[in-house]
Amino acid sequence: MAVMAHTNGDYGVQAAVAAGVDSLEHGNYMNEESLAMLAESDTVWVPTLVTVRNLLGDGRYDDETLKPIIESAEENIRKAFRMGIKVAPGSDAGAYRVLHGKGIQDEVQSFVEILGDQDAAYRWLAEGEAEIKKKFTVTVHW
């Protein structure tokens, strides 16, 4: 059975990766040690970037509060790409300002913007998505 963990911060991320989770959702506020653990693991990271990015200009939160969170997440995406961390797209659809359908489009576009290379972003996300599908596919024998 595959296991998915929803966590943020180094303690939660490191505990989840050490436990061998198959998929790590969110993973905000990671340091170098957390990223290194992910790089050495079989865990696929699903960052859900749009949950914060889509709040910019909305007025619900001050943009100056959101920008450092977004910048940190973007830097970790670039580091994860360079480190070969397995990453898959996921939008946290249904969260505030993350519409079903459009949320995943926004998420993929975020990766393209952050990496500055559409083909590289698509390949990286496709590889991670394939890994997620493999891990979470259940074969039922009747």
Locate the predicted segments by residue.
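Short Asp/Glu-rich motifs
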Residues: 14-16, 35, 56-58, 99-100, ...
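Active-site gating loops and adjacent loop-to-helix segments of metal-dependent hydrolytic enzymes
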Residues: 41-68, 108
